[in-house]
Amino acid sequence: MTAFRTALASTMLFKKRANVHDVVVFGAGKQAYWHIRLALLLRGDDIHHLNIINRDFERVHQLLEKLYNPHEAPSNFNPDPSYVPTYRQAAGEGEKEGQQDQHQYLPRPKIQILTPGHGEYPRLLHATLRSSSCIFLCTQSPTPLFPAVILTNPEGRKKGRYIAAIGSLSPHSTELHPDILKQNVAPEHGHRHFHKHAQQGGAVVVDSVDRCLKEAGEVVQAGLGPEQVVEIGELVMLKRDADRRRKECMAGKGMEAEGLDVGGVELGECEMNKNEKKNKARRGSSKEKEKHHEGEDKAHKSLIEWLVKGNVIYKSVGLGLTDVVVGGDLVRIADERNIGMRIENF
């Protein structure tokens, strides 16, 4: 469940991205499996290339068999994207052998497996990362998985990417080079850049500010402060708050117009003059509020632009609360489907 809930959090931002054509995944364990599976379930039709990078080719082979043939894996996985595997349900469920299980179907992009043992690994790694639109780092590597310069030089910065680093969980381990984080939090200057680059957000998105500042190797070694990281939950609340303000603003305009009509009909001349002054003051105050809200809306649009198209880095160290939430939902689903056994007063 830990790998599943970690991938759920990572893909919250991934599913909103404008471009997810080229997905790169480092690793071939449970974390990699769930990140790939959820990515395909959420945006599979938009993913054109899936590149899996791992030291052991056989582990990637096993991951793909489990992914595309969950009931009975074939002896040899066919990497041809035109090949559509069939699935078998458990015996006794009334389905004919070989009939495709629609509940297990996953879109099939073009899949490439890359291992460091390949003779042209450096060149292929460079090309794969440069073309990537999303990178999931799902290993326990103590050192960066690739040189920072691939993404930090002018050519590497042209394309906006979503990077999720979820494997390293100690201050001394870094899957992602700290220089990439430093560049991502660097302030944007008002003047035009000689080299065009994707929007930087000025912050790294994390699951927990306190824990990442102490435990996440990438964050610690990049020397980031509290003002340079933002919790993913806060981004969700900002969106909800912006939506609420817009609704309140529209409701306020309606109430103001209604008040003017009532005052004009029911009040005497003297009271009307007093009311007009109040309404003028109210309108002036409303205009100030509107200007304030316009500024907030621009900031909100800029935030959305960054999250959807810019360079976004998400770092996770794991939260126990997510285990409780996901576990509760799994129990609820099991109850609804009458699966498993409940032990009362356990």
Which residues are covered by each model-predicted region?
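A glycine-rich, Thr/Ser-enriched phosphate-binding loop motif common to dinucleotide/cofactor-binding enzymes
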Residues: 1-14
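Glycine-rich adenosine-cofactor-binding loop
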Residues: 10, 17-43, 48-59
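Short glycine/serine- and small hydrophobic-enriched flexible loop segments
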Residues: 11-16, 328-332
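Residue-level recognition of the N-termini of beta-strands and the immediately preceding loop/turn
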Residues: 21-22, 47-50, 111, 159-161, ...
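NAD(P)-binding Rossmann-fold cofactor-contacting core
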Residues: 42-111
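Rossmann-like adenosine-cofactor binding region
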Residues: 91-95, 105-219
